[in-house]
Design a protein with these regions (language model features):
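N-terminal helix-turn-helix DNA-binding module of bacterial transcription factors
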Residues: 1-57
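Bacterial carbohydrate/catabolite-sensing allosteric modules
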Residues: 7, 39, 82-90, 135-143, ...
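Short strand->helix junction
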Residues: 22, 69, 101, 184-185
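Short gly/ser/thr-rich secondary-structure transition/capping motifs
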Residues: 39-45, 99-104, 251
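Structural motif corresponding to alpha-helix initiation and N-cap regions
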Residues: 44-45, 104-106, 127-128, 219, ...
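Alpha-helical recognition/docking segments in bacterial nutrient-uptake
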Residues: 58-167, 171, 231
Length: 335
C-alpha cells in the first residue's frame, strides 16, 4: 500500500479506504488508486470487481438491540447466520450497522461511510427517524418482520403461528388462556390478531386482565408478569409467552410458587430456538425458520442491487411450524 500511496500522492489510509470500498473519498481519487493498484499487481478480487461494477460487494446489516442481548441471542443469531451464508454464496461481505457508536452519525451516514451497496434491517425501532431516513434513501433496503411501502420485506407468518398455537392448546382442553405479548410492533400486532381470531373462532372468551404487555427477550419482565397472573383468584390454565427466551422467566416464577409445568399450569413459547428443546419439559412452541428468513432477506437485497429494474418489491412470507413438546397438559375436562 505504501508504494501505491507514494505513486498516487495520497496517504496509506486513503489507499486502504479505496481498496476496501469505502466511499468517503473522492471518486476521482478512488478510481486513480484502484487503477494504480491494478497496474502494480496489488488488486484484490473485491477491489477489481468494485472498479468494474461500481459496487463494493458489501451488505450492511442494521442490528439495534434495546435489550443488549447482542448477537448471542439465539433467534437473531440464526437470522444473521442466514444472511451471512447467502451473502457469502454470492461473494458479498457484510458489515454490521448499529447504535453502539457515536449518535452524531446517523445510520445512513454510517452506511455511506462503510460504502455498503444496500442494507438489511434485521432489528431496529422502525419508528426511529434515523431508520425512516435510511429506508427513504437511495440505498436498496430490505426489512425483516416489518413492512414499508415499495420495499422488499421478509416476514414470518406471525398471525398463522399464533392461531395454530391457540388451536393446539384448545385441542388439549384449555380455554382459560393468558397471553404475555411483546412491545407494540408489527410482529406483536399480527400475533395479537391471530390470538383473538383463533379464540373467537373457537368460542373461547378472552379476559382482558389475562392479556398483558411485556417485552420481547425479557425473562425478568415475564417472571414478574407470570407471578401476577398466578396471584389472581382464578388462574389461567395455559400461559402464552412472547418468545422462548422470555419463557425462562415464567418457568422460574412457576417454580418459585411451588408449581410445576405442565402438571399445575401449561405454557407455550414462540420462535423454536434450541433452548426450547433442552428445557424440561420440552417447550411447545412455534418454530420460525430463522435461517430461511435471513437467507431470503440477503437474496432479496442482492437481487435488488444487481437487478434494480426487474426486482419485485414484495412481501416474502417464510413459513414456520408447530414444535410439540411436553409443556401443555391434556386436561380431563373442558371448562
Amino acid at each position: 500500500m505504501k508504494d501505491i500511496a507514494h505513486r498516487c500522492g495520497v496517504s496509506i489510509a486513503t489507499v486502504s479506504k479505496a481498496l476496501n470500498g469505502q466511499l468517503d473519498i473522492g471518486e476521482e481519487t478512488r478510481g486513480r488508486i484502484l487503477r494504480t493498484a491494478e497496474e502494480m499487481g496489488y488488486m484484490t478480487n473485491a477491489a477489481a470487481r468494485a472498479l468494474k461494477t461500481k459496487r463494493t460487494y458489501n451488505l450492511g446489516v442494521l442490528f439495534v438491540d434495546p435489550m443488549h442481548g447482542g448477537l448471542a441471542h439465539e433467534f437473531f443469531s440464526a437470522v444473521l447466520d442466514g444472511i451471512r451464508s447467502e451473502a457469502e454464496r454470492s461473494n458479498y461481505d457484510i458489515t454490521f450497522i448499529n447504535n453502539l457508536g457515536s449518535r452524531a452519525s446517523t445510520y445512513l451516514q454510517h452506511c455511506r461511510y462503510r460504502g455498503v451497496d444496500g442494507v438489511v434491517i434485521a432489528s431496529a425501532d422502525f419508528t426511529d427517524p434515523m431508520v425512516t431516513e435510511l429506508v427513504n434513501s437511495e440505498l436498496p433496503v430490505v426489512t425483516i418482520d416489518h413492512v414499508f411501502n415499495n420495499h422488499i420485506a421478509v416476514v414470518s407468518d406471525n398471525t398463522r403461528g399464533m392461531e395454530e398455537l391457540v388451536r393446539y392448546a384448545a385441542s388439549r382442553g384449555h380455554r382459560r388462556l393468558a397471553l404475555i405479548h411483546g412491545e407494540k410492533t408489527t410482529v406483536t400486532l399480527n400475533r395479537l390478531a391471530g390470538f383473538y381470531r383463533a379464540c373467537e373462532a373457537l368460542d373461547i372468551p378472552v379476559r382482558d386482565e389475562w392479556v398483558r404487555e411485556g417485552v420481547f427477550h425479557d425473562p425478568q419482565g415475564c417472571c414478574r408478569i407470570t407471578k401476577e397472573l398466578l396471584a389472581q383468584p382464578e388462574k389461567p390454565t395455559c400461559i402464552f409467552f412472547p418468545d422462548d427466551y422470555s419463557y425462562i422467566g415464567g418457568l422460574n416464577a412457576v417454580t418459585e410458587a411451588g408449581l410445576r409445568i405442565p402438571e399445575d399450569i401449561s405454557a407455550v413459547g414462540y420462535d423454536g430456538i434450541p433452548l426450547s428443546r433442552i428445557v424440561s419439559p420440552v417447550l411447545t412452541t412455534w418454530r420460525q425458520d430463522t435461517a430461511g428468513m435471513g437467507a431470503a432477506a440477503a437474496s432479496g437485497l442482492i437481487g435488488l442491487i444487481e437487478h434494480p429494474r426487474t426486482a419485485i418489491l414484495d412481501r416474502v412470507v417464510v413459513r414456520g411450524s408447530l414444535q410439540e413438546g411436553g409443556s401443555v397438559r391434556q386436561l380431563t375436562e373442558t371448562r
